[in-house]
Amino acid sequence: MVKNKGLGRGLSSLLGEEVLPIKSEIVQIINIDKIKPNENQPRKHFEYNKIKELADSILNNGLLQPIIVDNNFQIIAGERRWRACKLAQVLEIPVIIKNFDTRESMETALIENIQRTDLTVMEEARGFKYLVDNFNYTVEKLAERLGKSRSHIANLLRLNNLPQSIQDKLNENILSMGHARCLINHEYAEEIANHIINHDLNVRQTEALVRQWHKNEYKKSTNNTNKVGKLCFKDNIIDNDLELLVKALSKKFGIKITIDNCNLGGKLMFHYKDLEELDLILSKLN
C-alpha cells in the first residue's frame, strides 16, 4: 500500500497533533453512491485530464489509498480519488470513517488540500475565508494552525474582496496574485484588469499603472455615446517599434520627440525651443 505522505505528514506538522497511520485505522468497503462530496471543500476546480489519468490508474491498480469520510459519509479527504472512481465506474471503494464534527471535517479537508500544488490561489483564499467566517478564526490563529505566515494569510483573505470576474481570472491563471493584489478595493478594478490583460503587463508595470491612477495621471474620454467616461491609462510602456519610431523622428527633425501612449490612443509630441525651431519643424512636415 502506498503511504500517503501528503496527508499524514501534513496534519502532524500543521496541526501539531498525532495522526495515526492508515494501517491502524479500520478500512471499510462502501458503496460509492453513499459517499458525498464536501460542499465546503476549498477545491472547486478539478481538471478532467488529471482525473482521467487517476481513473485509468485505479482501473489498473485499484484504489491504493482509502478515502476518509465522516459519519455521514461526507468526504473529508480524497475527493479527487472519489471522482476518479466514479469516472472508472467503480461500485465499491475502501473508506476510513472518522468521527469528526463539521469543524474538524472542514479543517482536515482544507489542510489536506492546501498541501497540494494544484490548488488555485482563490480556492485557498476562499478556504481561509470560510474558516474565518464560520469558526471565528483570526489571521494569527489561522497562521498558527496552518503553519503559514500572517502576511500570506492576510494577503489571500483580501483577494476575496475582488470582483468575481477578477477572481475567475485568477482561477484561470489569466492574472497572477501579484496583479490581483494591486486591484483590491479599486473602484475600476475590472477596467484595469482588462487593460493589464490586453497589454500583457507584468506585475511591476501594473503597480506603476495603479500608482499613476492614484496620482490622477489618467484621463476620461468624452467620446462615449453613453456618457460614461472611458479610462485612458498612461502606460509609460512603449513597445520596440514605437521606441524606434521616436528615435528615428528625433534624428530626422533634430529635436526632442516623445510619445504618450495609452489604451485609447496616444500623443506624439514635438518639443521646440523657440518659434524659429517651430517653423523649421513645420517646414519639414510640409
Swiss-Prot record:
GO MF term list: DNA binding
Spans traversing the lipid bilayer: none
Biological source species: Rickettsia typhi (strain ATCC VR-144 / Wilmington)
Keyword DNA-binding annotated: yes
Biological process terms in GO annotation: chromosome segregation; positive regulation of sporulation resulting in formation of a cellular spore
Protein name: Probable chromosome-partitioning protein ParB
Keyword DNA-binding attached: yes
Keywords: Chromosome partition, DNA-binding
Protein's job: Involved in chromosome partition. Localize to both poles of the predivisional cell following completion of DNA replication. Binds to the DNA origin of replication.
A Pfam family that the UniProt record links to this protein: ParB_dimer
Signal peptide positions on this chain: none
Organism phylogeny: Bacteria, Pseudomonadati, Pseudomonadota, Alphaproteobacteria, Rickettsiales
PANTHER family, A to Z: CHROMOSOME-PARTITIONING PROTEIN PARB-RELATED
